[in-house]
Amino acid sequence: MIITINGIPCECEKGEYILQIARRNGIEIPTLCHHDAFAGQGCCRLCIVEVVTKGRGRIVVSCVYPVDGECEVYTDNERVRRQRGMILRLLETRAPESKEIQALCEKYNAPKFDRFIKIDGSKCVMCGLCVKACAELSVGAISTVNRGVTKEIATPYHEPSSVCVGCGSCAHVCPTGAIEISETNDTRTIWDKTFKLVHCSSCGAVIGTEQEIWYAADRAGEEFDGLCATCRQKRIADVFAHNAGV
């Protein structure tokens, strides 16, 4: 099936999301809440595009909009730019300290609105990526709490989580750097909890926190061998080479 994006013919399969098709063809669509490791969420709505079918156009969220037939897609026309600019300023109101949001506002010439009251000191746009990463890749230690303008991401009762393993997946996927994580040579601190770091017994590289390694080993049903992924691969290669007489 062929659709056109900004006048460019793009091959695709029925059911593919517009964002996937655009990126595969080198067409830029801005996103915040999207990560290739997870299904689309449509939370930030920054990836809106206009889809025209049979002469009728409508604004859709490209990361969760599956193509079901031939259509024309516009990622940066006047209608899209106007709505995207409003979305960016609303996101800036939510996260005025985010340099990423400020850069996007400048890049897409988002109009300024004095009537929006900014939330002081915030970088979080409530995209939900951190919660999704923790739930799908780790232990589900964080969640959204409260409602309205007081809605935020937190551990239960804002106390150090008893189940958090300190893997840092939440901070890694955060698009605005809202989650604070700090490390020394021996410790990692995140969500007001400090974890002891484990180093590779061969090369000394940081592998992860003790809790993270225990959790991963338990899920895999294997014992931890004390090696990082690189040294483990090297050891396996050495075994193969020895057995082959190389």
PLM features per residue range, with description:
Residues 216-220:
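Long terminal segments
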Residues 187-191:
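Short, intrinsically disordered linker segments that flank or connect zinc-binding domains
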